[in-house]
Amino acid sequence: MTFLQYFKTDGIRGKVGVNPITPDFLLKLGWSIGIVLGKNKTQKIIIGRDTRISGTMLQSILEFGILSTGVSTLLAGCMPTSAISYFTKSLNASAGIVISGSHNPFYDNGIKIFYKNGVKLTKEIEFSIEQKVQHTFLYPDYVNFGHSNNILDPESLYIDFCKKNFPKDLNLSKFTIILDCANGATFKIAPKIFEDLGARVITVAINPNGVNINQNSGSTNILMLKKIVLSESADLGLAFDGDGDRVIMVDHLGNQVDGDQIIYIIAKEYLKENKLKGGVVGTSMTNMGVILGLKKLGIPFCPAQIGDRNVYEKIKEKKWILGAEKSGHIVLLDKHSTGDGIIASLQVLLTMINNHMTLYDLSNQIKLFPQVFLNIFLKQDKDFEKDIKIQNILTQYKNILGQNSRVLVRRSGTEPCIRIMVEGEDYLKVYELAQYIGKTIKLL
């Protein structure tokens, strides 16, 4: 297998109208997906999308390519990414496709693909699709077109699935929950699930207009959520990203609870309930405080490369069931085959009930190390790997920050930027080193 040109950390993503998110490419992509993934007994592919204004247009183009191969489609409409994973498996489809730009602004969009078992494609299958895209598009025999149909009441199907993962007597009536749906794919489903389970729900960002997805809201911008949690004296806040596969939480005091803390809370509960299999998979970004906290509990930790697919693959390799990214991708393989913000939230709420503890109490059982994150957006790529100053930092940072420290500098797989993470025990030193690295990269 050689270098993947289009598929990155989480599918294909980019600005709409700029290669590869163009009509020509998506037509061929749909055709290629139909040929590579659609040829089995069922010959049907699920398609869902988030609330972006470009979603229906891109869906139509992609669907034409798929139908032209003789493969039929089942349209789910606007649904969370994790719902498409569930439908792909439960409806016995050949594949599932999500048209979403995740946490990116509205002018970006992308394609995520699930295999028939509801998990993200392997790199080998992605390569096969890319190879087919290079071929000349063959105009179809119209008699052999696939058929386009809608999934009947997809919201109810997915809501039932989420609920069935938890005890029938789960009662959230003691909680006031602020839900920030980022004007994205969870805007209908999330409020209904939590209300059905008895919670008092106050909603934020549930009025999508096609261009306000993730705008001053969602898992990457929780300032508004923090303010509302405090002003409403709520028990907690939940912020999903645009396609609903991430969640970041806010406790009743307005403190952020990220994916690292969430997976620690869940792992400790699974250990207590004797449900834990092996340990926890994280990434190179997982906070050192969480790793040390898991170690104290006797829970092994294994890092995977960045990306929820990489986390999933490492969990399967280790034959474990838990994994997470700091950004809020929480994988609970005993409940679902992919990251799911709603299911992760319900598990934390169940843990709060079982232990008679607030989210603040649960998340403060570990001491997080100071971390500083910077995104350096670039107009053109910069070869920072060969810069002597950067290399000196990457080899000698422990002399500055101490042994319990880390420095990571990497290219983003989803945006045109360099991501910097500096971690250590002294916040001032961590902050100063992060700023120095950022300035150095900008001057390259």
Swiss-Prot record:
<keyword id="KW-0413">Isomerase</keyword>
<keyword id="KW-0597">Phosphoprotein</keyword>
<dbReference type="GO" id="GO:0005975">
    <property type="term" value="P:carbohydrate metabolic process"/>
</dbReference>
<feature type="active site" description="Phosphoserine intermediate">
    <location>
        <position position="102"/>
    </location>
</feature>
<protein>
    <recommendedName>
        <fullName>Phosphoglucosamine mutase</fullName>
        <ecNumber>5.4.2.10</ecNumber>
    </recommendedName>
</protein>
<dbReference type="InterPro" id="IPR005844">
    <property type="entry name" value="A-D-PHexomutase_a/b/a-I"/>
</dbReference>
<keyword id="KW-0479">Metal-binding</keyword>
<feature type="modified residue" description="Phosphoserine">
    <location>
        <position position="102"/>
    </location>
</feature>
<feature type="binding site">
    <location>
        <position position="243"/>
    </location>
    <ligand>
        <name>Mg(2+)</name>
    </ligand>
</feature>
<dbReference type="Pfam" id="PF02880">
    <property type="entry name" value="PGM_PMM_III"/>
</dbReference>
<keyword id="KW-0460">Magnesium</keyword>
<dbReference type="InterPro" id="IPR005846">
    <property type="entry name" value="A-D-PHexomutase_a/b/a-III"/>
</dbReference>
<feature type="binding site">
    <location>
        <position position="245"/>
    </location>
    <ligand>
        <name>Mg(2+)</name>
    </ligand>
</feature>
<comment type="similarity">
    <text>Belongs to the phosphohexose mutase family.</text>
</comment>
<dbReference type="InterPro" id="IPR016055">
    <property type="entry name" value="A-D-PHexomutase_a/b/a-I/II/III"/>
</dbReference>
<dbReference type="InterPro" id="IPR006352">
    <property type="entry name" value="GlmM_bact"/>
</dbReference>
<dbReference type="GO" id="GO:0009252">
    <property type="term" value="P:peptidoglycan biosynthetic process"/>
</dbReference>
<dbReference type="GO" id="GO:0004615">
    <property type="term" value="F:phosphomannomutase activity"/>
</dbReference>
<dbReference type="Pfam" id="PF00408">
    <property type="entry name" value="PGM_PMM_IV"/>
</dbReference>
<dbReference type="InterPro" id="IPR005841">
    <property type="entry name" value="Alpha-D-phosphohexomutase_SF"/>
</dbReference>
<feature type="binding site">
    <location>
        <position position="241"/>
    </location>
    <ligand>
        <name>Mg(2+)</name>
    </ligand>
</feature>
<dbReference type="Pfam" id="PF02879">
    <property type="entry name" value="PGM_PMM_II"/>
</dbReference>
<dbReference type="InterPro" id="IPR036900">
    <property type="entry name" value="A-D-PHexomutase_C_sf"/>
</dbReference>
<dbReference type="Pfam" id="PF02878">
    <property type="entry name" value="PGM_PMM_I"/>
</dbReference>
<dbReference type="GO" id="GO:0008966">
    <property type="term" value="F:phosphoglucosamine mutase activity"/>
</dbReference>
<dbReference type="GO" id="GO:0006048">
    <property type="term" value="P:UDP-N-acetylglucosamine biosynthetic process"/>
</dbReference>
<dbReference type="InterPro" id="IPR050060">
    <property type="entry name" value="Phosphoglucosamine_mutase"/>
</dbReference>
<comment type="function">
    <text>Catalyzes the conversion of glucosamine-6-phosphate to glucosamine-1-phosphate.</text>
</comment>
<feature type="binding site" description="via phosphate group">
    <location>
        <position position="102"/>
    </location>
    <ligand>
        <name>Mg(2+)</name>
    </ligand>
</feature>
<dbReference type="GO" id="GO:0000287">
    <property type="term" value="F:magnesium ion binding"/>
</dbReference>
<dbReference type="GO" id="GO:0005829">
    <property type="term" value="C:cytosol"/>
</dbReference>
<dbReference type="InterPro" id="IPR005843">
    <property type="entry name" value="A-D-PHexomutase_C"/>
</dbReference>
<dbReference type="InterPro" id="IPR016066">
    <property type="entry name" value="A-D-PHexomutase_CS"/>
</dbReference>
<dbReference type="InterPro" id="IPR005845">
    <property type="entry name" value="A-D-PHexomutase_a/b/a-II"/>
</dbReference>
